[in-house]
UniProtKB/Swiss-Prot annotation:
Name of this protein: 4-diphosphocytidyl-2-C-methyl-D-erythritol kinase
Organism phylogeny: Bacteria, Pseudomonadati, Pseudomonadota, Alphaproteobacteria, Hyphomicrobiales
This protein's encoding gene: ispE
Regions that span the bilayer: none
InterPro entries to which the protein is assigned, alphabetical: GHMP_kinase_C_dom (IPR013750), GHMP_kinase_C_sf (IPR036554), GHMP_kinase_N_dom (IPR006204), IspE (IPR004424), Ribosomal_Su5_D2-typ_SF (IPR020568), Ribsml_uS5_D2-typ_fold_subgr (IPR014721)
GO biological process: isopentenyl diphosphate biosynthetic process, methylerythritol 4-phosphate pathway; terpenoid biosynthetic process
């Protein structure tokens, strides 16, 4: 939950943007799911979910990208799927889960590689447990989250972590420092299944974490040797990703990489003022793009 909630709602829960600082594809299961090793953190920016008890279920949407979400149809929205899944789980335990008005403030682009839908689902699960005064064991909650998508369990965590398996094997990384970052998306949706199907190599070198890195500079050096194995096929599918990456480099980013399956790219900067100046420069040159200077979660000092 966060201060400065959505007006008219009893509770507001943040759904922060997920950033894959590195994403290595290391294999593929017999069922077709790819095995990943990913260094993940979360930004201060993101969507928000408002909740209040109601006489009937309602779902409303606002925010810059509300229209894009509505165009997809409410039936497939992860917020509603999370509500229905948790309600069934609680009903099976003989517990009440009354009608609720859910409101999604959609501030992140759709299909952008920064986990917007997964974060929305995770925030909905956390928010409904609070609104309904219910508890679910951590293992059961993670199981529910995984039914909604491979990224949802890590979005429940919201702290720096390493994700393995299909994304559900989570190891917290409390010593990862925060980073000043600029997120840029050219507002071109990228299909995750298409990018995975386009992978030429399904088995790539594993993610190697530094043993003694503590400072931001040490982590930047270590991350420079990491990869996003989805970036080459994503660039081939959507050449605009290269344009975005070049814009971040030209603006002075110390490290530039694509997040998830794209098309969002991030640039890491040495200080928030530098990040904000870069965001202003990129926005001036590309006023229709999504450009956001922000800071990530992490251990300061």
């Amino acid at each position: 939950m966060q201060a400065g909630g959505i007006p008219g709602f009893a509770l507001t829960f943040a759904a922060p943007a997920k950033i894959n600082l590195a994403l290595h594809v290391v294999g593929q299961r017999a069922d077709g799911h790819h095995l990943l090793e990913s260094l993940v953190t979360f930004a201060e920016c993101g969507d928000r979910v408002g909740l209040i008890a109601a006489d009937r279920d309602r779902f409303t949407v606002s925010g810059r990208f509300a229209t894009d979400l509505s165009a997809e149809g409410n039936g497939g929205n992860l917020v509603l799927r999370a509500r229905d899944l948790l309600r069934r789980e609680l009903a099976a335990q003989g517990r009440m889960a009354g009608p609720v008005h859910l409101h999604l403030e959609k501030n992140l682009p759709i299909a952008s590689g920064i986990g917007g839908g997964s974060a929305d689902a995770a925030a909905t699960l956390r928010g409904l447990l609070s609104l309904w005064g219910a508890t679910v064991e951590a293992a059961s909650l993670n199981s529910l989250a995984l039914q909604l998508g491979a990224d949802v369990p890590m979005c429940l965590d919201r702290g720096p972590l390493v994700a393995r398996g299909i994304g559900e094997e989570i190891t917290p990384l409390p010593d990862l420092p925060p980073f000043d970052v600029v997120l840029v998306n050219p507002l071109v949706a990228v299909s995750t299944p298409v990018i995975f199907r386009s992978l030429v190599r399904k088995t790539n070198p594993p993610l190697v974490l530094p043993e003694d890195a503590r400072s931001t500079a040490e982590w930047l050096t270590a991350m420079a040797a990491m990869r996003n194995d989805l970036e080459p096929p994503a660039r081939a599918h959507e050449p605009m990703i290269e344009t975005v990456s070049n814009a971040l480099r030209d603006a002075g980013a110390a490290l530039v990489r694509m997040s998830g399956s794209g098309a969002t790219c991030f640039g890491l900067f040495t200080g928030m003022k530098s990040a904000e100046r870069a965001a202003e420069t990129i926005s001036a040159g590309h006023p229709r793009w999504y450009v956001q200077a922000t800071r990530t979660a992490g251990k300061s000092g």
